[in-house]
Swiss-Prot record:
This is 2-amino-3-ketobutyrate coenzyme A ligase. It comes from Escherichia coli (strain K12). Its EC number is 2.3.1.29. Binds 1 pyridoxal phosphate per subunit. Keywords: Acyltransferase, Pyridoxal phosphate, Transferase. Belongs to the class-II pyridoxal-phosphate-dependent aminotransferase family.
């Protein structure tokens, strides 16, 4: 029986390789930055990191992390409620809450844990969750853990969302919660939070937003999609990560009203049974928030880079998805073309990843590019030139 188990895994791995679905982990030997070094020693320009503000290797963050270790140690060796809460943890939670315009915040090991520990803690069998069809896997998995009745609506479709809200209310749901990404990361599309909040008001529902791909750089002050959509104060729960724009290390959080956060501290299993966030990450994250609030220079640079790439790629004849975001998917359609395109780009010194089914729908394969404030205009032009050469070779553009 044990032999059959391992043989089944071997067969499944071989099938994944044969179907071109096996995920290879390419090795980077440098720090995460715009210009990275890969295993063969070559230098490539990275266009597939979540390093939106270019802070992953920023000297001020490295200095803050070192200072955090000097003053607070390397690790906590405990969960928060036993002996794993330092003054810096509380400071970061307060700063996150204030930055997001929420009453309180709670730290997790990751946003995946924040979402995984949210729904089952707050909702029960008498309740309903209405989730966008393109929500992140962490929301999907978190909802699965909850006993609430589950509904799904087509991506960003307010008419269908209203239909699901009516269904939930007609079924007698006690509490109804709408769950959505703030930015749909495969498409670079910002959620229609104005429409979501309007419907939530109409049907007396709660709104939860995972804003991992927005906090730090979306909105006038970088507060996220709720600022961009002018619905600050109307979103009940915001989850997010410290592993993207806010330094790129690890850690997640949930921000909400005080009673929500206090209940999560009492009952949220990923919070109760996971080690506290490391002091170095906490210290660096506090520094990130100070930098983001100090001025718009990094955000301005990021958006200038995104505009340049989108304009030059459109002029070259490429079909691009999304709008108003640093995620700019280059649509290719065919999975084989997407994989070959990505391989050829790396030979040209441009580091990207092709996405295809089952990550995206069949026939919608793409290369998801992500701009960073760390990119220079010259690097972006070089990337567009490489895309154009290979696009012509593969018949993607004329």
């Amino acid at each position: 029986m044990r032999g059959e188990f391992y043989q089944q895994l071997t067969n499944d791995l071989e099938t994944a390789r044969a179907e071109g679905l096996f995920k290879e982990e390419r090795i980077i030997t440098s720090a995460q930055q715009a210009d990275i070094t890969v295993a063969d020693g070559s230098h490539v320009i990275n266009f597939c990191a979540n390093n939106y503000l270019g802070l992953a290797n920023h000297p001020d963050l490295i200095a803050a992390a070192k200072a955090g270790m000097d003053s607070h140690g390397f690790g906590m060796a405990s969960v928060r409620f036993i002996c794993g809460t330092q003054d810096s943890h509380k400071e970061l939670e307060q700063k996150l809450a204030a930055f997001l315009g929420m009453e309180d915040a709670i730290l997790y090991s990751s946003c995946f844990d924040a979402n995984g520990g949210l729904f089952e803690t707050l909702l029960g069998a008498e309740d309903a969750i209405i989730s966008d069809a393109l929500n992140h896997a962490s929301i999907i998995d978190g909802v699965r853990l909850c006993k609430a009745k589950r509904y799904r609506y087509a991506n960003n479709d307010m008419q269908e969302l209203e239909a699901r809200l009516k269904e939930a209310r007609e079924a007698g749901a006690r509490h109804v919660l709408i769950a959505t990404d703030g930015v749909f990361s495969m498409d670079g599309v910002i959620a229609n939070l104005k429409g979501v909040c309007d419907l939530a008001d109409k049907y007396d529902a709660l709104v939860m937003v995972d804003d991992s791909h927005a906090v730090g750089f979306v909105g006038e002050n970088g507060r996220g999609s709720h600022e961009y959509c002018d619905v600050m104060g109307r979103v009940d729960i915001i989850t997010g990560t410290l592993g993207k724009a806010l330094g790129g290390a690890s850690g997640g959080y949930t921000a909400a009203r005080k009673e929500v956060v206090e209940w999560l501290r009492q009952r949220s299993r990923p919070y109760l049974f996971s080690n506290s966030l490391a002091p170095a990450i906490v210290a660096a994250s506090i520094k990130v928030l100070e930098m983001v609030e100090a001025g718009s220079e990094l955000r301005d640079r990021l958006w200038a880079n995104a505009r340049q790439f989108r304009e030059q790629m459109s002029a070259a004849g490429f079909t691009l998805a999304g709008a108003d975001h640093a995620i700019i998917p280059v649509m290719l359609g065919d999975a084989v073309v997407a994989q070959k395109f990505a391989r050829e780009l790396q030979k040209e010194g441009i580091y990207v990843t092709g996405f295809f089914y089952p990550v995206v729908p069949k026939g919608q394969a793409r290369i998801r590019t992500q701009m960073s404030a760390a990119h220079t205009p010259e690097q972006i032009t070089r990337a567009v030139e490489a895309f154009t050469r290979i696009g012509k070779q593969l018949g993607v553009i004329a």
